[in-house]
Amino acid sequence: TDESVDVFYSCTVCQSYAPDHVCVITPQRLGLCGAYNWLDGRANYEINPAGPNQPIMKGRTLDLDKGEWEGVNKFVYENSNRKVERFCGYSLLEAPMTSCGCFECIIAILPLANGVMVVNREFPGVTPSGMSFGDLASVTGGGAQTPGFVGIGRLYLSSPKFLAADGGIKRLVWMPKALKEDVRERLQKEADRIGEPDLIDKIATEENGVSEEEVAEYLASVGHPALALESLI
């Protein structure tokens, strides 16, 4: 778990086209491209100590709920061309991780639904945010820190640390049907863990709505737990 280690790992492979981006890989949050997890980062550093995967000493805990550590902030600042001053690993709204352009999925806030949507690269349509994956990528990528939008690896969706500071998986209100089925088994385990065994079937897909208003109506009809959480904004 993130609590059981003192070291995270960085990945800066994508700085050639997103020079201010630093990926922070933890035991419970893999790289946003989906290709690197914490064990990969450790192994790559041992093989190539001067490579793009460097150890990040967590240091003093600043906010455990949001996933903010003094050592991580220092590392990210020094390795983002001094552009990114803070990093909160478990929040979409406060100092989220930057994104390059290689993300498997994009998380975006849906204020009317009091939750977030996720879309994968393969989905060709327009999402309830009013944007396609490509449109969202132009907002999210490039190394800028954009509260409300973040790129992720799809397996992060089922992590106990997924948006833990913002309400976790209970905030997930819309995703493409194909993506839902692809990660259903993993999501179900997390839903069971938090005592919401029916959650996965309450998450809307393009079959239930493609506008934020339609999604909000669907959530109300099925009693999605996001509607009972405090306002996201």
PLM region spans:
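Cysteine-centered metal-binding/redox modules
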Residues: 1-233
